[in-house]
Amino acid sequence: MKSIIPPQNLSELLKRANMMAGISLAQIATHRGINVPNNLKRDKGWVGQLIEMELGATAGSKPEQDFLHLGVELKTIPIDNHGKPLETTYVCVAPLTNIEGLTWQNSLVCHKLQRVLWVPVEGERHIPVGERRIGTPTLWEPDPQEQALLQQDWEEIMELIALGKVEKLTARHGEVLQLRPKAANSKAMTHSISEDGSLKMTNPRGFYLKTAFTAMILNKVFG
């Protein structure tokens, strides 16, 4: 399978993304010689990976933006027939140790969300995976108010992690950003800070954008 050359500039990336609008996932997969899964229960990241590949994303699983040379992160977002997000959006793994001196400005969440190319995809479960169509993409940069909301949530969450209270953090914490266990296997474990400052074992956590926030982003663009 021939790999796609990364886009040279922002206009080329947007052109590629706009050319996908209205196309089904099966059309892209067939063109690339990729099998379409019957469902996404075991292939949760399949849609995102397919679109990353088609657009020529470079990051893979590295902790950096998908198009680092353009300063753009790619996010596919499953939507219902009213254009509303169907699930939260994964941003990145949350650091649970060695966080002394970490600030919002030098955090991976801030880096990833500086500029995002949102690609909506039909996500209603009654639509077979291959028949789901890609929507119109939009390039988003957080405005000062959105940036402030993200920073406030991140700082509050990180403060609780630093105090050894990661177990007390639930998906309800945060107005726009939440912390949740991040592992397909609940037996996966990693180190975190305990309340007495020593290390303990816990499930890995990830940062996610809440659906109300992503709905607001899409609504600003598409009304």
From Swiss-Prot:
GO biological process: DNA modification; mismatch repair
Keywords: Cytoplasm, DNA damage, DNA repair, Endonuclease, Hydrolase, Nuclease
Subcellular location: Cytoplasm
Gene Ontology molecular function: DNA binding; endonuclease activity
Top-level division of the source organism's lineage: Bacteria
UniProt cross-references to InterPro entries, sorted A to Z: DNA_mismatch_repair_MutH (IPR004230), DNA_rep_MutH/RE_typeII_Sau3AI (IPR011337), DNA_rep_MutH/T2_RE_sf (IPR037057), Restrct_endonuc-II-like (IPR011335)
Residues spanning the membrane: none
GO CC, one annotated term: cytoplasm
Family listed: Belongs to the MutH family.
Function: Sequence-specific endonuclease that cleaves unmethylated GATC sequences. It is involved in DNA mismatch repair.
Protein name (record): DNA mismatch repair protein MutH
Gene: mutH
